[in-house]
Amino acid sequence: MKKLILFYLPDCNVSKLFEERLHKALALPEFAGRFNLIRYNLYTDTGRQEAKSIGVNDAPTAYCNGSVLRGVQSDYSIRKYLRSILEQS
């Protein structure tokens, strides 16, 4: 199972939309059970430290194995991103 990190801002509609689309994609049979989603709030010290350690400075952002997906994305773009991560291994 791959560790997929989501960096978000809790009061941001863009972050909420991004997270909803990500959850929708992760529920598809193609991806179900293949990712462990970890959420970091960028308003917390832990979230900021984790983001800094991998070079992320904005939200919403998804990160897995060096691959980064930033900003509002379509459902298609999120699925494409997840497929590319799975193909890396």
Regions found by a protein language model. Name each.
Residues 1-31:
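Local sequence-structure signature of Cys/Sec-based thiol-disulfide redox active-site neighborhoods
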Residues 7-9, 31-47:
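Thiol-based oxidoreductase modules, predominantly thioredoxin-like and allied folds used
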Residues 13-14, 45-46, 76:
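Short alpha-helical
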Residues 17-20, 49, 73:
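Generic recognition of short, well-ordered alpha-helical segments
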Residues 21-23, 27-28, 56, 83-86:
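Cysteine-centric redox/oxidoreductase cores and disulfide-bonded domains
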Residues 52-64:
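Structural micro-motif
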Residues 63-89:
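Non-catalytic, surface beta->alpha helical segment in thiol-disulfide oxidoreductase systems
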